[in-house]
């Protein structure tokens, strides 16, 4: 069997996974399901990293993606749905999607929350209907150790991102290339 044929099988599987993850309407959750998932995710995040509660209280808005599925083998994709919370109330629904190519293999599920600390960052999200991470307002990724040393007087950036509930077999985690788009629910 030629090298081209041997490589075609995994490539076809990866392409099928990419299309399924990013384009499957059956994956779309209802507004009520998203709200329940966001409530549970925030409670879990605040319990595991208590400093995020203070960060959320100071934020102009918090965009929470409770469950993002990422899969890949050479080609990869990720998709998740979430809600924007302003003063504790849902102000809109968004999805996040990304595609990638490179040396990668595995499946991972995770969530993340974006804390919008300035009016301009929140307005950028709502006026643009979404944005591609890496363009627009600056984003600082906090891990649980950094968050513990964090105080409300040290928040000087537009957006802080905190990852949570990471499960799976994929190494590395990044926001580069992720596109966030507004959804109608």
What role is predicted for each listed range?
Residues 12-22:
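Bacterial N-terminal signal peptides
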């Amino acid at each position: 069997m030629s090298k081209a044929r041997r490589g075609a099988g995994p490539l076809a599987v990866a392409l099928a996974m990419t299309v399924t993850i990013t384009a499957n309407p059956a994956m779309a959750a209802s507004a009520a399901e998203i709200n329940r998932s966001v409530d549970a995710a925030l409670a879990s995040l605040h319990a595991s990293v208590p400093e995020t509660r203070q960060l959320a209280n100071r934020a102009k808005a918090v965009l929470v993606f409770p469950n993002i599925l990422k899969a890949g083998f050479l080609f990869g994709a990720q998709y998740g749905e979430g809600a924007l919370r302003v003063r504790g109330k849902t102000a809109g629904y968004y999805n996040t999607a990304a595609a990638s190519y490179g040396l990668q293999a595995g499946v991972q599920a995770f969530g993340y929350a974006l804390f919008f600390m300035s009016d301009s960052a929140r307005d950028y999200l709502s006026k643009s209907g979404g944005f591609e991470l890496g363009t627009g307002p600056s984003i600082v990724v906090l891990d649980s150790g950094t968050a513990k040393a964090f105080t409300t007087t040290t928040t000087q950036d537009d957006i802080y991102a905190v990852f949570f509930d990471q499960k799976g077999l994929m190494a590395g985690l990044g926001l580069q290339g992720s596109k966030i788009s507004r959804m109608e629910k």
